[in-house]
Amino acid sequence: MKRSSNLLILTASLIAKDAIRYTPAGLPVIHCQLHHDGELSEAKQIRQVRMNVEAVAVGDIHQELLTMDLGAVAVFEGFLTQKTLRNERLVFHITKITSNE
């Protein structure tokens, strides 16, 4: 398997989360929406960045997402991949959550 870099670190607020579901293999899954609002530097200019991100927590990490209140801000780490083989829309797969309080 070829290894490559695909790491996203995003400070965001949790704005929506679905109920727990389970994969056919029995892994817990929670789909959620994150909102990022901040300023970044691009080409020596300050750029306002606002976006909503579709995200999913699979496996043990779902416990942390489950206990988070809507509106809570955290640092989310994970990777991007397409939603399904046929749907190329990107989804953020969360692998780590660090409280931002």
Where are the language model's segments positioned?
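Single-stranded nucleic acid-binding surfaces, predominantly the OB-fold ssDNA-binding core
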Residues: M1-E101
